[in-house]
């Protein structure tokens, strides 16, 4: 009897595995990025080739609940003088998540994510990366609320780099000279509580973030964000947000962002403004968590000690070609004495040759008050999915 039960269990397991694999989806992508960057008269080559593979196993008939994994390999050659190593090989686990949806009523649902998946704060500029954790979200017509917690110490710092608080004695552990495919990242525990209340065509957003530092610096960061977004008219939207950050409750800094977008058929025109505090009055320098550079200058510039005002236009031609252009003015706000820092522009196009093949060309240039910061970047990007 016991042998028959084992055989039955084995047969059922094989049938279940076969059905699961038959229902599974898979695919991949190849990217080739050829970049020339540096001083206008001495551009240097930066070559980046990547291959990624993904697999998805549905766990429900509607395909809203699923298991998803994505791995990638990148080869990078960087001839710039600022590069510590010319050649880098990078292996990464981009996604490894279980995603589940439960419909609670015709107008409400519950979502649970577990594993490694990307997430971003409300501004999209402070914490925008993957991490290993849990995300629980409840959404209805009257309210949306979520909780989040994760750990960053198992990430590959060659892919996701977090900014250290050097004043607290911690340096980034990303060492580009290493031959390792995978270098463990800085250790933080991000936690978050998010609330969104829709009313008419508007949204009120309230977020609280904490980043518990498990590195030697023990510099814990806490953020509170308040935002409003929605439509002023049928074709005009806005998004206004401000965030206050404290480090170990010993300092206060601010990051504020405003955006207006006008939609006219296939054309979008956007105006934006950004303030990231420096040593301005009672404010300390604002330091985001994820490394992200808004200025195209020769020296990396984070969202800290700057004021940026910009305009951007996007035009879609026959749903095949997207043409875009934008320009920004940057003010140096690292001290109380505000000073003009520079002007930058970006322009390019995305051409969908086929549904699974895209060619992009992008030009970016920064003109600084200090000419040592001047930089030109030219990119040709080929992306293919299969």
Predicted features and spans:
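Short, solvent-exposed loop/turn segments at secondary-structure junctions
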Residues: 74, 119, 276
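Long, well-ordered mid-to-C-terminal structural blocks that present hydrophobic/aromatic surfaces
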Residues: 250-292
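Surface-exposed coil loops of outer-membrane beta-barrel proteins
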Residues: 33-39, 80-95, 106-226, 281-312
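Sec-dependent signal peptide hydrophobic core
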Residues: 9-13
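Hydrophobic h-region of N-terminal signal peptides that target proteins for export
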Residues: 14-22
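Well-ordered, non-membrane alpha-helical segments in soluble/globular domains
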Residues: 46-52, 185, 189-190, 257
